[in-house]
A protein has these predicted regions:
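Hydrophobic membrane-insertion alpha-helices, especially the h-region
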Residues: 9-26
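Soluble extramembrane regions of membrane proteins in the secretory/endomembrane system
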Residues: 32-341
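Acidic, glycine-enriched catalytic cores built around paired aspartates
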Residues: 29
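N-terminal Lys/Arg-rich, disordered targeting/topogenic segments
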Residues: 1-6
Length: 341
């Protein structure tokens, strides 16, 4: 190869240009690392909430305890209608028409107009959302309209009781599928952590065919609102991957805010979880990616492990992640009883 380059000056110049071009992203990565000599701990609220239910302490007491130990950031998952339904403390119910009609005397549970919608439904995938407060009704309806293109639904509000009946949309999306659309962070959860002085990091879950421009814009606005230091992707796709405009908006937000792209380790710790488009996103944001050590279930279970009396081996995995694999964030999850692990 050396002899060929000596005989062909043009080829040598091309090779040199190629070498220099390859150094540009490398230098960018090195500079990013030099300005990134710290580690951070981000609390996973979902697992902390499960732990609180298994303990004698309240959520507030646990949140205060972690704050006293220096943990001041929390990842809050955006909720779907089904997530809200599964939370007994939130007065929201979501189900398909088929499920709603399974209970005895179901028609008596709804206003006459709403019951008529359900009776006339010809698609078992049509969905109904029922709220027990007007504020919940408005929050959910506004979220659907902000995040889904050309959202259509029949709505009914009487006093504090609201109903949203969702049928097949213009793009063919079934009502049942829309129950999985992430709507935002439930306001009471936001208030809980703001009251305790935590910095909130919104974490959404993308769904194919529901990850367009409106969804990306709404999620980015949420990141801006909370001034999130990290973008933590989760779900089927990279946020906004379904169109170029959305990816441009995400790139612009990250560059303007200085927020880093959180790259979650795989459970075998060999590589990071990736989505199509994430490499380009890193390229276009100055390689501001930070590696995240995720406490997978098998690590959470290393309590009294390797002869230790307590969680020492879990702590050791934190140290190895930071010192050996250059992880900058510990995604802190709780030690749970096996039935909720």
């Amino acid at each position: 190869m050396k002899s060929i380059l000596k005989r062909n000056r043009v080829l040598a110049v091309i090779a040199l240009i190629g070498l220099l071009a390859s150094l540009v992203p490398l230098i960018s990565r090195v500079q990013a690392e030099k300005s990134n000599k710290y580690y951070d701990i981000v609390l996973d609220y979902n697992s902390m909430r499960s732990m609180a239910r298994q303990s004698s302490q309240s959520e507030d007491e646990w949140i205060d305890l972690f704050k006293s130990l220096g943990v001041d950031k929390v990842a809050l998952s955006e909720a779907s209608a089904l997530n809200l339904h599964d939370n007994a403390a939130i007065p929201v119910y979501a189900m398909t028409v088929k499920k709603a009609a399974e209970s005895y005397g179901w028609e008596d549970q709804y206003p006459a107009e709403v019951a008529q919608w359900l009776r006339e439904s010809t698609d078992v995938s049509d969905a109904i959302i029922w709220t027990e407060t007007a504020a919940s009704y408005e929050w959910i309806l506004n979220a659907f309209e902000a995040r889904f293109e050309d959202f259509e639904a029949k709505t009914y509000l009487e006093g504090e009781h609201g109903f949203i009946f969702i049928q097949q949309q213009k793009n063919g999306m079934k009502g049942e599928k829309l129950l999985d659309l992430r709507l935002g962070i439930w306001p009471d959860t936001v208030e809980l952590f703001e009251r305790h002085g935590y910095q909130i990091i919104p974490r959404s879950v993308t769904e194919k065919n529901m990850n367009g421009t409106k969804f990306a814009k709404a999620y980015i606005e949420e990141l801006k609102h909370f001034n999130a230091p990290y973008f933590m992707n989760n779900g089927d796709e990279l946020v906004g991957y379904e169109d170029d405009e959305s990816l441009e908006l995400l790139t612009q937000y990250l560059n303007e805010s200085g927020a880093s792209v959180a790259m979650m380790e795989q459970n075998d710790q060999s590589q990071n979880l990736v989505w199509p488009g994430v490499e380009e996103l890193l390229d276009n944001t100055g390689y501001r990616g930070v590696r995240v050590f995720n406490e997978w279930a098998y690590i959470q279970n290393r309590y009294q492990y390797c002869g230790y009396e307590g969680p020492e081996e879990i702590t050791n995995t934190f140290f190895r992640a930071i010192a050996e694999r250059n992880c900058k964030i510990i995604f802190l999850k709780m030690i749970l009883e096996p039935d909720t692990d």
